[in-house]
Amino acid sequence: HGKFRRQRQMCIRDSYSIASSPDYEPGTVHLTVGIVRYNHHDRDKTGLCTGFLADRCQVEETDIGVFMSPTRSFVLPSDGSVDAIMVGPGTGIAPFRAFLQQRDINGDTGRNWLFFGDWTEEGEYYYRDEMESWKERGLLDKHDLAWSRQGSEKVYVQHLMKKNGEEIWKWIDGGGYFYVCGDKNYMAKDVHTTLIEICAEFGSMTPDEAKDFVETKLMKTEKRYLRDVY
């Protein structure tokens, strides 16, 4: 029974968006994992998979089974000259790091705009050095940051979208892609609502027309609004 339990504990399976391009650093896969830790009825709890990766995996000493599941529905534009707006707060930044690496390797000329955020700049600015380097080089044309626990005002990515609504509309109206990755319960819904509001205001549409434009034309017909939410 003890052996069976031990084996069961090792059969942990979870899915993560890959945070690296296979062409950028061949032979490696990078993940962006948020450790789940919380207190329940005065007992400290840790997520099975994230706790295993954080607390029990010894670097270069632990073998982990990896199963790749390629997606054909959350990919870069086939035309490298197309602009891309990426909204990925928290660990939602993962695929966009991979996207930017790939666009860098490809020499794509399309503009890149990243909306990122988390609690604080000091504690959760993931891949800061890379992002700032890409911004300096011009690979990352625009980089908007939202910190929800820094200062007196809570700022989220959808607030920065509203602030940049007119320019977002210009990118989309010009054929740009719009990507969202991360929390589906709150963030993705708020971003979706904000995108519809932006299209209504700056695309001269009624609320119903904007909703149809986003949910039918962008998402289903042209597939320029792509989501990886969890």
Model-derived regions: residue spans:
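Single conserved hydrophobic/aromatic residue that forms the stacking wall/gate
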Residues: H1-R8, I12
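Active-site beta-strand/loop microenvironment that shapes enzyme catalytic pockets
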Residues: G80-R103
